[in-house]
Amino acid sequence: MGKYNLILSEYLSFIYNSQSAVQIPIYYSSNSDLEKRCIEFHSKCLENSKKGLSLKNIFLEYKDVTENATLLSILSYSYDKYNAVERKLVHYAKGKPLEADLNANELDYENNKLTSDLFPTAEEYTDSLMDPAILTSLSSNLNAVMFWLERHANDTAERAKIYKRRLDLFAIVASTVNKYGVPRHNAKYRYEYEVMKDKPYYLVTWANSSIEMLMSVFSHEDYLIAKELIILSYSNRSTLAKLVSSPMSILVALVDINGTFITNEELELEFSNKYVRAIVPDQTFDELKEILDNMKKAGLVDIPKMIQDWLVDCSIEKFPLMAKIYSWSFHVGFRKQKMLDAALDQLKTEYTEDVDDEMYREYTMLIRDEVVKMLEEAVKHDDHLLQDSELAGLLSMSSASNGESRQLKFGRKTIFSTKKNMHVMDDMANGKYTPGVIPPVNVDKPIPLGRRDVPGRRTRIIFILPYEYFIAQHAVVEKMLIYAKHTREYAEFYSQSNQLLSYGDVTRFLSNNAMVLYTDVSQWDSSQHNTQPFRKGIIMGLDILANMTNDAKVIQTLHLYKQTQINLMDSYVQIPDGNVIKKIQYGAVASGEKQTKAANSIANLALIKTVLSRIANKYSFVTKIIRVDGDDNYAVLQFNTEVTKQMVQDVSNDVRDTYARMNAKVKALVSTVGIEIAKRYIAGGKIFFRAGINLLNNEKRGQSTQWDQAAVLYSNYIVNRLRGFETDREFILTKIMQMTSVAITGSLRLFPSERVLTTNSTFKVFDSEDFIIEYGTTDDEVYIQRAFMSLSSQKSGIADEIAASQTFKNYVSKLSDQLLVSKNVIVSRGIALTEKAKLNSYAPVSLEKRRAQISALLTMLQKPVTFKSNKITINDILHDIKPYFVTSEANLPIQYQKFMPTLPNNVQYIIQCIGSRTYQIEDDGSKSAISRLISKYSVYRPSIEELYKVISLHEQEIQLYLVSLGIPKIDADTYVGSKIYSQDKYRILESYVYNLLSINYGCYQLFDFNSPDLEKLIRIPFKGKIPAVTFILHLYAKLEIINYAIKNGSWISLFCNYPKSEMIKLWKKMWNITSLRSPYTNANFFQD
C-alpha cells in the first residue's frame, strides 16, 4: 500500500522545495480511539506549522497514528510564487534547440512556424489546431519528467541506461522549450495568444507528445524510435505517423505461420500446428521498398533501418519490434486540420464518367437486398419497435449538440443551449415539434459540422444533423443491428464475440491453397462516388419493404427513413472560414447519422461481394469467409491448386483493377498468411493490436473533470500496456497526483492518498496494482467507502430548476403516457432520472455539480465523516465471504502457446495456464427472459440496475410492472408463475455481479473464467440449493486466484466451507447491492 504515498511525499518535497513549504499528512482510522488521536495529531501539526516550528517531535509523539492509521491526504502549502519549472528546466537544457523546417508540410498552417507568423493578430488566433485538450499543463508534464529524472539520477546497471536514454531525450525537449520559455496555461488549461505569439505554434502539443514518448523509453530500440519521432515530429505535423505506420500492411504478409490458433465449431480458440508459407511476389517487395524510400526521404534513418534488418529473415520472434514501431508512430499526437481542408479533402477526388455501370448496379442491388433481408422479418410481423419508432427514438435521444444554439425557456429560467434533448422539450412546449417532417439540409439550411481527429490520418468531418434525423433512423437501425448481431460477416456486431474470435476466423482457413484479400475502404466510404449508389440502394430497399406491410405506422417509419436518405442526397455543409461561413455542396457520406456504422458495414459487404463476383469470372475459388469490420473488409479465398507467387500477383492486380473500375480509391492487398486492418493485425499466425492511445494529448474537450481525466489517463495507460506500449508507471502515478490534487487557496493544496484513489468508491481513479481490481475488505477501506458514499450524489440548482419547470415535466409525462398502459412508478421515475441526467452535458449544470463535489471532497479529505449507510456494496459481500476461505499452494503447468505476443508477462502467464476467452460475458441482463418479454411488447429497455431491482420485488409487483409496459396479462401471469422466473432471478443477479466486478474490462476480458484448470483449484462443498451463493463464492475464488497469479506468478488453491446458516443471510444481502459509478468505471466504459 505504500508506493503511491511514498512517491507523493517525495514529489511534494520536489515541487515545494523552499524553506516556507510545509507538508502535513492527514490520517484517519475506523477505530474511534485511534481516530481521536488522528484529529489531535492534525491540529497539532497545523498549530506548529503556523508558528513555523518543526513537525518532527509531533511525528514521534504520535507514532501510533503514523504506524496504524491510514493516510487520507497530504495538505501542502508554500508561500513561494513558484516559477520552479523554468528554474529547474535550465539544468536540463544543455542541448541544441530544434529548428523547425518551415516547408515540411503541404498546408502552411501545419508548419511549426511562430504563432505570430501563422496568426498575425489575437483576433485571428485559434488554439483549435494545437490544443492538447487535456486538463493538465505542459509545466506539470515537465515537472513530472524532472521529478522522475531527479529520483533516478543514481540508478545503477540496466536502470542507469534507461535513465541515460531518457535524460538524453529530455535534453532535446528541455532545450527547445527553454529557448522560447515555458508557455503558461490559463485556468482552463488553454494557451492564449499572448503566451504563444513569440513561440512555435505546435510547441505545446509537440512537447506533450515528446514527454509521453520519452517516458515510454526502456530499451535501446525504444530510444532510437523515440529520438527519431521526437525530432521529426517537431517539423512534420502532417504525415509522419502515416509514413511510419504504412509498411505494416505489407509486413504482415511476409511472416510464415508455424503453429497458430483457429476458431473451432464451438467458437473457442484451439491450437493448430499447421505451417503456412508466406508467398510474396516481387511486386510486393518493390512496393515495400518504395515505402521505405519515402521514409528515408522524410528524414527517417533508424526506423527504416530496423525494418530492413528485420526483412533479412522476417521472423515472428523479432516481429514485436515491428509492432512496436507501428504503435509508437501514433504517439506523435493528433493531426488537427482546419475544417475547410478536412471537408475539401473528400471533394477533391476527380469525378470520372468512365466507370463500370454494371458493377455499380450490382453494388446498389446488393445494398438493396441486404437492407431488405435485415428488416424483412420485422416489417412483415409489424414489429412494435417499427410502429412506435418515434417513442423509441425519443427515449434514446442523446444530449449531444443539435447544431445551433437556441434560447430556451424552462419555467422562469431562460437559457441558451445547443443540446438535442433540450430542443426537443422546447419544441414540444411550443408546438413546434413535428417528427413527421424531416427538415431539408440543402443550400437554405446547410449542416453544421463536428470533427474527428486521429493520429496519422486526416481530420474527418461529422454531420451534426437536426434531431429529427435521429428519431427517424433510430428504430430501423436498431433492427438492422439485431440482424447483424447474428450474422458472422459483421465482425464488429457479431453476438458477444471479441477480437480474438475474429482472429481465429481468419487463421482457420489459411493454408497453402488459400489467400486472404484485405482492403481498407475508409477512402471509399467518404468518397463522392459512393453517395448516389449507396443512398439509392437503401431507398430501393425501403421501397420494397414498404410493400410488405399494410400497417400505416410501419409504412410511416419506413417513409421517414427514406426521406432522410433523399434529403441527404442533396446536402450542403456550413464551414466557418475566418469570419465568413462558407456553404459547400457536399456530395459524400459523412458520419453523424445514426445509420453510419450499420450502413457502412452493409455497403462494404456489398462492395467486397461485387469485387469477388468479378474476380470469380477469371479464377476458380471458394470464398471461405467474408468479413467487414468498420472501414475494413477481408475475405479468405480457397483455390483448388497450391498458391504460387504468380497467382498472388495476378489476383492482387486484378482486385486492384476491379476496384479501379468503380473509381474506388482503396488500398487492397493480397497475402497468404496475415492481414492488417484498423482494429488489429495478424502476423505469423499471432494477433497484434495497435497500442496507439495518446496519453498527454486528447482529441477534444468534453465536460469531464480533472479527476475523470486522471482515470482516463490511467485506463489508457493500461490498454496501451496490454497492447505492448508501456509508459513508466511512476510517471503515470505522478500525473495522477497532479491531476487529482485540489487547490484550496493559492498557496494551499490537498493531495488525496492512494487509499482514497484506489478504493472503489465514487472517487476511484486507478488500481494500486496494474491489472488487478481490488475490492477492499479491511475496516478502514469499508469505512472510507461508506464515508464517500454519503457525499456521492451532488445536487445542481439549475438542473432542479429545469426539472421543476412545466416544459420538462410535460415532456417526461408525455413519454411515460405513450410508453405505459397503466401506472408504473419505477419506469416513470427511471425516465425522469434519465432525462435529468442528460442535463449534465449542459455546462452550467456540470460546473455546478463539480463545485459541489469539490467542496464536499475538501471536507472529506480533511476529516472523513462517519456515515452509517444501509447500502451494501460489493465490498461488503466479499468482506463477509473472505474469512471462510482457506488458501494453500498449488501448481498449474503452462499448457497453451502464446498467441498475443505483446501482452505483459504476468498476464501472458495466466492465459498460458488457464486459456483465453473468445466471448463477452453477458453483463446487461439482455439474455434474461424478462428482458426478452419486455422487448417483445415494448420499446422500453430497462438497465441491468433496474432489472435487478424489479426481479427482487414481490411477484404481484413484477406482474404489475410487466402489464404496465403493455405485456398482455396472460403472458405476465405465465411468466411470474413459471420456473423461468426463478431462473431469471439467478441470471440477472449473475449479470449484475459480473457488471459490478468489471469482468469484461481491463485484462479480465482475456481470461477464461470457466476454465476447468481454474475450477480444479477451488473446493467448495455443496450445501443446499442457493445457486446465487454458490456463484458468488466461486467467482470470488476465481478472482482471488487470478489476482494472486498476476501478482506473484504462481498459483494457489482455495477451500471454502461456508456455513449453511450464513448462506441465507448472504443471499438476502445480495439483493441490496448498490452499484458505484466512479471516474474509474466511466473510463473503462469509455474504452468500450
Swiss-Prot record:
Q: Check the record and name the Gene3D superfamilies matching this protein.
A: 1.10.357.80, 1.20.120.1390, 3.30.230.140, 3.30.70.2480, Viral RNA-directed RNA polymerase, 4-helical domain (1.10.10.1990)
SUPFAM superfamilies from the UniProt entry = DNA/RNA polymerases
Q: Which cofactor does it need?
A: Mg(2+)
| RdRp catalytic domain residues | 501-687
Subcellular localization, per the record? Virion
EC class of the enzyme, as a word = transferase
Report quaternary structure and partners.
Answer: Interacts with VP3 (Potential). Interacts with VP2; this interaction activates VP1. Interacts with NSP5; this interaction is probably necessary for the formation of functional virus factories. Interacts with NSP2; this interaction is weak.
Catalytic activities: RNA(n) + a ribonucleoside 5'-triphosphate = RNA(n+1) + diphosphate
Protein name, entry field? RNA-directed RNA polymerase
Keyword vocabulary terms for this entry: Magnesium, Nucleotide-binding, Nucleotidyltransferase, RNA-binding, RNA-directed RNA polymerase, Transferase, Viral RNA replication, Virion
Q: What is its main location?
A: virion
Entry's Gene Ontology cellular component terms:
virion component
**Which family is this protein grouped under?**
Belongs to the reoviridae RNA-directed RNA polymerase family.
Tell me the function of this protein. Answer: RNA-directed RNA polymerase that is involved in both transcription and genome replication. Together with VP3 capping enzyme, forms an enzyme complex positioned near the channels situated at each of the five-fold vertices of the core. Following infection, the outermost layer of the virus is lost, leaving a double-layered particle (DLP) made up of the core and VP6 shell. VP1 then catalyzes the transcription of fully conservative plus-strand genomic RNAs that are extruded through the DLP's channels into the cytoplasm where they function as mRNAs for translation of viral proteins.
Organism equals Rotavirus A (strain RVA/Human/Japan/AU-1/1982/G3P3[9]) (RV-A)
Q: Which GO terms describe its biological process?
A: DNA-templated transcription; viral genome replication
Q: Does the keyword Nucleotidyltransferase apply?
A: yes
Q: Name one GO molecular function term.
A: RNA binding
* Organism taxonomic ancestry: Viruses, Riboviria, Orthornavirae, Duplornaviricota, Resentoviricetes
